[in-house]
Each structure stands twice: as structure tokens, then as C-alpha cells.
Amino acid sequence: MKAESVSQWILVILFATLLFFAFTGIFVSTLLVVLTPEGFAFLLGFLGALVFANKLLFGYGSFVITAEAFLTNKEIDRRELAKKTNEPVERTENLSIPALLALWLAGLDYYRYAYYGIFTLMLIIMLLSKFDLLGALTIGNYFEGAFWGAAVITLFVFALEITANYLMARINEEVSLNG
């Protein structure tokens, strides 16, 4: 029993040491990448998209948590849910929880359209610069770096959007089956 405990502690210490070396290596390599102009453009594109997609990331994330709570029959505060729809109280006071969830999801569409519109504009500018229509030798690499930085955040937004729409479809199916 004692040898088991000692071996477990040795493995935990070894794992912590490996994690430390991995994270310091990632940190150093990240610093080296940012020293290049393309890496800096990637970082700026990543941070800019993160700021712009903040409402979508937290909105879809909160929606997914609330929808999963509804599907597992956990208690959901109707007043808090009505606040998240950004609708007047008079309009939401007689609505069911699935209807409030649908309103909440529909309220995120404006931000989604704006975000995907800006991302598409970044894609067009990047492609124009890479096809040498804007001068690929001067600014093409910077636009490409910013685009790929924004693409990382867009992947998360897209994944959360798909998950939220899937959960809303499951809620609609459950409500229609239960009548």
C-alpha cells in the first residue's frame, strides 16, 4: 500500500514537471512567433475577433448551459431568462421557457450577422491581397495573419452556434412530443 502511494506521488510530480516544461516551451515559442510581423498580425486579428465576438461567445455559451439545464429538467429562473431575451416584460410574462429560449437565441442573430459579415470582409480583403490585387508583397502577409487569427475565434463561435441550434431543435422536439 505504501509503495503504491509513493509511486502515485512520483507520477504526479513527473506529470507536473512535464506540464511546466510544456507550458514554458509554449510560452517561449509564442513570444518568438509574435516577434515576426505576421505573428503580430495574427495576434491582433485574434484579439480583435475575440473582442468583437465576445457577445456571441458568452451568449451562445450561456444559452447552451441553460438549454442543457432545461433538457435535464433542472429549475430555470424565468425572470433571469426573460431578461436575457432583451424583450419588454409585458411580452415575456406569459411565455413558456422554450419560447423564451427561442427568443434569446433569435436575439443573438444580429450579432451573428455582423460578426460573420466582418469575417467575410476580412476573407475578401485577404484573398484580394493574396491574388496580388491589393499588393501581396506589401500587405498580403499581414492581412493573412490577421485573418487566421480571427479564424480561430470564428471556429469557436461557429461551434457554439451549431451546439445552440442543436439544443434548440431538441427542445422543440421534446415540447412537440410532450404536447
UniProtKB/Swiss-Prot annotation:
GO terms for cellular component: plasma membrane. It is a multi-pass membrane protein. The keyword Disulfide bond does not apply. It is found in: Cell membrane. Keywords: Cell membrane, Membrane, Transmembrane, Transmembrane helix. The keyword Transmembrane helix applies. The chain crosses the membrane at residues 9-31, 41-63, 114-136, 146-168. Its main location: membrane. This is Uncharacterized protein aq_757.
